[in-house]
């Protein structure tokens, strides 16, 4: 399939004449995007129940705290009480699709309906103007989970048990209230303040969904290292959150993810195999009770996996204050520091990629859908797909087109809707195109030498938290610089970016379709079918 349509060029002059095309379902045009300044009507509201007044009437926006795919988080001060808060300002122009708009609405709904909890960040208010949606929330200024652990110096199994109990309690509270988080990872937990006894809080509900008992989901979302096997199989429920919490616990105890490889497909295969390594240091120092809990949280069969309440009832969690208080050694702290810094490096690279992911790339796919949808019903039949692929120059044979159709047709209606079609095209085009990585590499290669050297890496990782230690730079260089010449070349950089990267930081829609594409690959090469034969579990396609 290497020659599928990697070089496809869409010719707008080739589209059907004298036909008024309707937009494909699920991919409505962005109502906030007005590049020519011709808007003559008020924009639609993203959050119907948001405050009608201006946010500046109530709050003072200060310095920037962080930046994401859709907007910027600012320090925010209540004019009357002087309380310090955080304001996440989401740019409407960056909500490119109806799916993006729905994501924001759902995040606000979930944060508004969850009961107050000491370990969940509180949404204080929402405001909306013509340009932005503003979410005013509790301020968490105590730093990320791993950064705090590294800074403390003394790190023990008892400390890991305390963190695990907090995360399990958040999961339990979400599930009791019909919320599946779907994106649990260390970066989504911040400490409220810098005090030693500060509360740890869950901060990001952007991929969360409401669920009913027995309801199953098919959308592939989340972050690579933390995905449960049933997510890759597109047939899952709230048990995925316990799996993700188990991955975090494994990392807390030994400093590295349980399922790792140099490519996303390798990570996915490791997750499907589900083999846990308890032989490397420091596992010999860790209690059998802790290992038992990790195994039960990372049980590949979701029907046998512990629930969040059962995690909280486990003896290791119940006796957290009695867990071994012996330091796990510098090896775990140094691994956690390297893991945290590597994530920071990837986040900076993804920010560069996000700025170069043009809306035109997605427009090409939209236009291809319109071109192939001969009867304008918002769906593409097998015959339309076959004819359309031939029209744009694809050399795919009949068996391969049939396989693509079968695997991508998630709802089994014999046709592809827009979302399913996007998955097929990304699968064929391999949207991780070289230009995106090249732009990010050039951002770090300040002197244009063709290499990222130690000082350039140090500069890239220096932020409001200060400069990284020499040991961290050395560790990252050691891992990424595979030819051991003391610098990172372009090929080594690409390998790093393809291993376990959270692509949602570049584009949430891109991430969704990317992992759907990965699922297609695994199904096509038989990996999932082999896994099912070994485990007796089935995949819902």
Curated annotation (Swiss-Prot):
Recorded protein name is Calcium-dependent protein kinase 30
Q: Binding residues for Ca(2+) 1, per the UniProt record? A: 373, 375, 377, 379, 384
Tissue expression from the record:
Highly expressed in root.
Positions of the UniProt region annotated as Disordered: 11-41
Where does the protein end up? Answer: Membrane
Q: Which UniProt keywords apply?
A: ATP-binding, Calcium, Kinase, Lipoprotein, Membrane, Metal-binding, Myristate, Nucleotide-binding, Phosphoprotein, Repeat, Serine/threonine-protein kinase, Transferase
Q: What are the start and end residues of every segment in region (Autoinhibitory domain)? A: 323-353
Domain (EF-hand) ranges? 360-395, 396-431, 432-467, 468-503
- Pfam families of this UniProt entry? EF-hand_7, Pkinase
In the record, which residues receive a covalent lipid, type N-myristoyl glycine?
2
The record, for SMART domains, names: EFh, S_TKc
Q: For Ca(2+) 4, which residues are the binding ones? A: 481, 483, 485, 487, 492
State which gene encodes it: CPK30
Q: How is its activity regulated?
A: Activated by calcium. Autophosphorylation may play an important role in the regulation of the kinase activity.
* Entry function: May play a role in signal transduction pathways that involve calcium as a second messenger. May be a positive regulator controlling stress signal transduction. Acts as a calcium sensor involved in the hormone-signaling pathways.
């Amino acid at each position: 399939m290497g020659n599928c349509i990697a070089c496809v060029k869409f010719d707008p002059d080739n589209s059907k004449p004298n036909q008024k095309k309707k937009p494909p379902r699920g991919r409505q045009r962005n109502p906030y995007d007005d590049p020519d300044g011709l808007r003559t009507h008020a924009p639609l509201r993203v959050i119907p129940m948001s405050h009608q007044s201006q946010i500046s009437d109530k709050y003072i926006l200060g310095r920037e705290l962080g930046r994401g795919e859709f907007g910027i988080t600012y320090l925010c001060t209540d004019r009357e009480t002087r309380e310090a808060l955080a304001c996440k300002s989401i740019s409407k122009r960056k909500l490119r699709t109806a799916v993006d708009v729905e994501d924001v609405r759902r995040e606000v709904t979930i944060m508004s309906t969850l009961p107050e909890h000491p370990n969940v960040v509180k949404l204080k208010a929402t405001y909306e103007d013509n340009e932005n949606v503003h979410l005013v929330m509790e301020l968490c200024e105590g730093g990320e989970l791993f950064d705090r652990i590294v800074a403390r110096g003394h790190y023990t199994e008892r400390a890991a048990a305390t963190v695990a109990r907090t995360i399990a309690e958040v999961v339990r509270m979400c599930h009791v209230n019909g919320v599946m988080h779907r994106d649990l990872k260390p970066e989504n937990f911040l400490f409220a303040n810098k005090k030693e006894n500060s509360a740890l809080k869950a901060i990001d509900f952007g991929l969360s969904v409401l669920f009913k008992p027995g309801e199953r989901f098919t959308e592939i979302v989340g972050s690579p290292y933390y995905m449960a096997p049933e997510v890759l199989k597109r047939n899952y429920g709230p048990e995925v959150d316990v799996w993700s919490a188990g991955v975090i616990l494994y990392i807390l105890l030994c400093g590295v993810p349980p399922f790792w490889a140099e490519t996303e497909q390798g990570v996915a295969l490791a997750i499907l195999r589900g083999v846990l390594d308890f032989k490397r240091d420091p596992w010999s120092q860790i209690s059998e009770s802790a290992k038992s809990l990790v195994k039960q949280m990372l049980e590949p069969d979701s029907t046998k996996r512990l629930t969040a309440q059962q995690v909280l009832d486990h003896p290791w969690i119940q006796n957290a204050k009695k867990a071994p208080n012996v330091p796990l050694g510098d090896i775990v702290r140094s691994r956690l520091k390297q893991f945290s810094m590597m994530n920071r490096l990837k986040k900076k690279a993804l920010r560069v990629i996000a700025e170069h992911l043009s809306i035109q790339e997605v427009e090409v796919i939209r236009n291809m859908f319109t071109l192939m949808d001969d009867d304008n019903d918002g769906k593409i039949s097998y015959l339309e797909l076959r004819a359309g692929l031939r029209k744009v120059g694809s050399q795919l044979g009949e068996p391969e087109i049939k396989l693509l159709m079968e695997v991508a047709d998630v709802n089994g209606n014999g046709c592809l809707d827009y979302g399913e079609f996007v998955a097929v095209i990304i699968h064929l085009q391999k949207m991780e195109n070289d230009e995106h990585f090249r732009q990010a590499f050039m951002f770090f290669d300040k002197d244009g030498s063709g290499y990222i050297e130690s000082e350039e890496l140090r500069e890239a990782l220096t932020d409001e938290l200060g400069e990284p230690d020499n040991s961290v730079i050395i560790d990252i260089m050691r891992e990424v610089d595979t030819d051991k010449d003391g610098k990172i070349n372009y090929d080594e950089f690409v390998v790093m970016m393809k291993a376990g990267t959270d692509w949602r930081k570049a584009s949430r829609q891109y991430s969704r379709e990317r992992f759907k594409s990965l699922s297609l690959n695994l199904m096509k090469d038989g990996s999932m079918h082999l896994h099912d034969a070994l485990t007796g579990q089935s995949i819902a396609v």
